Amino acid sequence: MKIHRLAGYIQNIYLVEYPTKLLLLDGCCRADVDTVYQFITEHLNRPMTDLKLIVVTHMHPDHAGGAYPLRKLSGAKIAASNAPGQWYQGLDGLLMHLTDMALAWWVAGRLGKKRQNLWYNRHLTPDYYLATDAQLPYFEEWQAIHSPGHTDRDICLYHSASESIYIADLLVKVKGELMPPFPIFYPRRYLNSLLMLKTLQPKKIMFAHSDEMNLAEINFATILDAVPETPMTHWRSVKAKARRALGFKRSSLRR
């Protein structure tokens, strides 16, 4: 087994290579489809049909956006959490889907990337639904570990033989420091997911938005202190900013 890390549009892409098959640890962005295609067919000199499984760790644009196009190109199967329903369901879900793509463009701008088409289907119908601790189809040495909090359906992917784990957005790096991601819809579940990682004691941790680390490099005490007690979501953020702006305006009028 060899794990290749590719530079994606706004995140790392992890492609696991075996002699007869390939595993994509996350669904990446729609803008990353050509990157994955070229790496497999040109760098590895392998047919796209060697890609057997694409895991979608959660439904955000940089983790699910390329799943359907890559399945169409390769015939690979898609696996995702067995969380009920769709993450982006209803009118609120549609608005959140649009907001998340706008946030992805904002991140791209901060990274100096040109704006690219990130549109993808907000509803996912995977070929396999993964229960917690389930083995991945075709790749039994990999295990799906549910790690909700960021959303209700986040999963990490653990390779027990090498004691390596891909944690997607469980932690992100901002200004050189690891911290909880935005948003966090379920703070208590998120706290439990962090404790799971700490208890598991992996030797290598792979991030979507940071370089690889070992467990000793992570200051869990600081991170655990930063976990919010209430949900930290798009709408709460907008409301809080509106209240602050309104309060400032009223204060200025009183002067």
Residue ranges and their predicted role:
Residues 28-31, 141-222, 227:
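Metallo-beta-lactamase
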